[in-house]
């Protein structure tokens, strides 16, 4: 059985050379090694956390990022490419996880702390 790799991007705008050098190039290499089950997703629901007031931007970016995936060499016959919001089981799992993690524990997470401070939610 091949190991599984799950990776993706939040479609908040166009991809650029940094995306390619930072991760896309490696995804294509891993895909072509045929040693892994590669799953690449467009995290449109996650993108809404930063762009809730402009969902149309996310919708448009999903298509653009999907085309960019194909352009750099991600091959749907070798990798599974999917959109987060199109998989209902992800929302179901999220509900279970939200019931397991308390607000106090969440607020201790350094990433969450930083975002709360940055967005002024703690005021």
What spans do the regions from the language model cover?
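N-terminal Rossmann-like or analogous alpha/beta NTP/dinucleotide-binding catalytic cores
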Residues: 3-123
């Amino acid at each position: 059985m091949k190991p599984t790799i799950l990776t993706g991007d939040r479609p908040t705008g166009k991809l650029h050379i940094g995306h390619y050098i930072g991760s896309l190039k490696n995804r294509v290499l891993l895909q072509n090694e045929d040693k892994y089950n590669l799953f690449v997703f467009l995290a449109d629901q996650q993108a809404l956390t930063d762009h809730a007031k402009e969902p149309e931007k996310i919708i448009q970016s999903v298509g653009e990022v999907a085309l960019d995936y194909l352009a750099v060499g991600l091959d749907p016959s070798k990798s599974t490419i999917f959109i987060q919001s199109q998989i209902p089981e992800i929302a179901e799992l999220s509900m279970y996880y939200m019931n397991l993690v308390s607000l106090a524990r969440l607020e201790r997470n350094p990433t969450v702390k930083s975002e709360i401070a940055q967005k002024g939610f703690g005021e």
